Amino acid sequence: MTTIVSVRRNNQVVIAGDGQVSLGNTVMKGNARKVRRLYHNKVLAGFAGGTADAFTLFERFEAKLEMHQGHLLKSAVELAKDWRSDKMLRKLEAMLVVADTESSLIITGNGDVVQPEYDLIAIGSGGNYAHASALALLQNTELSAEEIAEKSLTIAGDICVFTNQFKTIEKLDY
């Protein structure tokens, strides 16, 4: 699996992810990029789950963004509808975290689109560790969104065997 974390604070939104790709108990790759910029660099997206499945979802989500002129929520809901109703897509095992300057969302294979509390999202095998540490940092420090995402991903990587210390961090300032 992997860990993806998104933090929003002080006119900045960040999505960060580790780079580990595992096949069973074997590390296949340590420097995968699971966080990307989409739609003219105005949308950030990260994935946890099957890599091939996630790339399929990235492509479909980007097509939805183009169709809806970059409207994040509408694109996410339309992708979730397709994901839930299409027999081929229903078999895909991945989750997406997406964000723009206005919203941060989780899109699941069950057709859920969730806007989180505290402008904080963490998914994947190390998601609970990243979430707990990021929430503590949000509530008790003045660190930037980028610093919180980086530190919480480091903590998750120290605890979760399916999360490593290679990080991809993308941010939008607004």
Curated annotation (Swiss-Prot):
Pfam families recorded for this chain?
Proteasome
Q: Which residues does UniProt mark as catalytic?
A: 2
A GO biological process of this protein is: proteolysis involved in protein catabolic process
- EC number(s) of the enzyme? 3.4.25.2
Main location as per UniProt = cytoplasm
What does the UniProt entry say about where the protein is found? Cytoplasm
* Regulation of its function: Allosterically activated by HslU binding.
Its GO CC terms?
Answer: HslUV protease complex; proteasome core complex
Per the record, the similarity remark reads: Belongs to the peptidase T1B family. HslV subfamily.
* HAMAP family per record: HslV
Q: How does it assemble?
A: A double ring-shaped homohexamer of HslV is capped on each side by a ring-shaped HslU homohexamer. The assembly of the HslU/HslV complex is dependent on binding of ATP.
* This protein's name: ATP-dependent protease subunit HslV
Q: Which organism is it from?
A: Shewanella frigidimarina (strain NCIMB 400)
Lineage of this protein's species?
Bacteria, Pseudomonadati, Pseudomonadota, Gammaproteobacteria, Alteromonadales
| Gene symbol of the encoding locus | hslV
